Curated annotation (Swiss-Prot):
Protein name: Phosphatidylserine decarboxylase proenzyme
Cofactors (names): pyruvate
Source organism superkingdom: Bacteria
Gene: psd
Membrane topology annotation: Peripheral membrane protein
EC number: 4.1.1.65
Sites of Pyruvic acid (Ser) modification: 226
Function: Catalyzes the formation of phosphatidylethanolamine (PtdEtn) from phosphatidylserine (PtdSer).
Oligomer and partners: Heterodimer of a large membrane-associated beta subunit and a small pyruvoyl-containing alpha subunit.
PTM field: Is synthesized initially as an inactive proenzyme. Formation of the active enzyme involves a self-maturation process in which the active site pyruvoyl group is generated from an internal serine residue via an autocatalytic post-translational modification. Two non-identical subunits are generated from the proenzyme in this reaction, and the pyruvate is formed at the N-terminus of the alpha chain, which is derived from the carboxyl end of the proenzyme.
Signal peptide interval: none
Biological process, per Gene Ontology: phosphatidylethanolamine biosynthetic process
Free-text comment on the cofactor: Binds 1 pyruvoyl group covalently per subunit.
Active-site residues, Swiss-Prot/TrEMBL: 86 (charge relay system), 142 (charge relay system), 226 (charge relay system), 226 (schiff-base intermediate with substrate)
Amino acid sequence: MRRTLYRLMIELTNGRFTSYILRKFAQSRLSSIIIPSYVKVFQINQDEMEKGLKEYGTLHDLFTRRLKEGKRSIDTDASSIVSPVDGVFADQGPIEDTKTFDIKGKRYSIVDMLGNEERAKRYAGGTYMVIYLSPSHYHRIHSPLSGSVTERFVLGRKSYPVNAAGMEYGKEPLSKNYRSVTEVNSDGEHMALVKVGAMFINSIELLHERSTVQKGEEMAYFTFGSTVVLLFEKDMIKAVQELTSGQELRLGEKIATRVSHK
């Protein structure tokens, strides 16, 4: 019953018009009135922000803020995979040979997430990682490794919540929501960075258009909190043992080690 009611309420409120109004408000000067309250409620660290609070003219400007130089360091070990975002570590584990994995009692299909069988098959037997970004986090997304960009594509139209309630009661939001995917070939092994849109402010802006990317390089930004999913080929990485669900991660922090190079 809870799941049914939850989905009904989301469908009633999650329309294009609502998203349009919220997006326009966030981009308007009027939204600057609530910036101080937003910063206080979500406990945003002002010392890390590139600019002073009064220099952000809209909520959108605040959502997409950059950090001061030197506030994040990228792990320099050649074999390391780093967190592409500031966020909360949600889960990690094996991708089954059936190209599926389970989170919070839900089975997710890599075929659905990536749009077709051809893309998905290279990740069978591999590893997934999920990191959640709340409204308080820095919203820019960076590359977790260096390599050549092999494909960029967008899937889905609508987005549903990716918070705890959304993950429990929603319809596989990680593979159904609007999402932007970047695939990277690193020394012959592939990784997919899946940027999952959030409900209402359903926008992911790509900033990187070159054919190569360096570890820690800025790639995109969310205009509100959301989620990233990392997919790795079989036997490509070993996750850091200390990672636990609910753990805060910072951009550039080591989350895994490369275990083989083809």
